[in-house]
Each structure stands twice: as C-alpha cells, then as structure tokens.
Amino acid sequence: MHGGGFYHVQKYTVAPEEMPAELHWFKYEAYFTWLSGFALLVVVYYFGATSYLIDPARADLTPTAAIAASLGFLIGSWLIYEALCRSLIGRSTPALAVSVFLLILASAFLLTQIFSDRAAFLHVGALIGTIMSANVFVVIIPNQKKVVADLVANKTPNPALG
C-alpha cells in the first residue's frame, strides 16, 4: 500500500510466464532524483562557487577551475566504477564492494583537500548518486529492455541480464 493504492511488485528469477498488460519501468525515480540534485548543486555550489564551493585556505581555485574539478570528480568516479565492474574485480562481489568503498574513501579525502568541508561531503553524496543513476541509465535499463524484447519474441531471456 502506498499513497492510498495497492501495488503488487514481485521479482521473478528470470521472467514471468507472460508479460503484464502494462509494464512500469522504475527508472524515472533515479533520473529525476539525480537531475534535481544536480540542479541544486549547480544553483547553490556552482553559481555560488566563491561562497560555498571554494575554500581559499585549501586550494587557490577560480570558480571555473572548481566547477571543472567538481564535474571531473562526478564523471571520473562513474568511469572508474564502470571500469571496476567490467574488470576481474567486478566478478567478485566482495572485491567490488571493497574497491568501491576505497574509491569513495579516496574521493572523500581528495575532495576535502580542495573544496570547503560542506562542498566536499556533498560531493561524496553526489558522486554516489551519480554512480547509481548512471548505472540505471547505462546498464540496468538497457539490459532490462533486452529481457523484455526476448519475452515479447517468446525467447528465453538471458538470466545474466536480470
């Protein structure tokens, strides 16, 4: 029950016997959460870079350089995460978990060396959110579309995609 309505959400090992008449994709929640968070990051920390993003006691950055560093961390962390997932490390859940934890820890340390405290730790959250949303956009949804296409074509879906 949520919002006055009843829902039946069930995860199948591979796929249901038949496709439901209406299929709800749980992707927009991730996309809109990231977009709204990024919009707030831009409005508060990028437009107010000299007040909120930059700490002159830590690094002598121009607003443009600080914003570039911010974007570099967000994009770079996702690229590193993707590389880890596609490497041998990605085949072992414990190894991947430790590697991602170390990535977040190293990022937090580096961010506190160049940004204000508040901006640094906000960026750690933004970094995690970026990784999660990008994973939904680049990996999860495309794979789910392949599974659905197989079901519609009466083929057996590849369980590795689910």
Predicted regions and their residues:
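Polytopic transmembrane helical bundles with strong interfacial aromatic enrichment
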Residues: 1-162
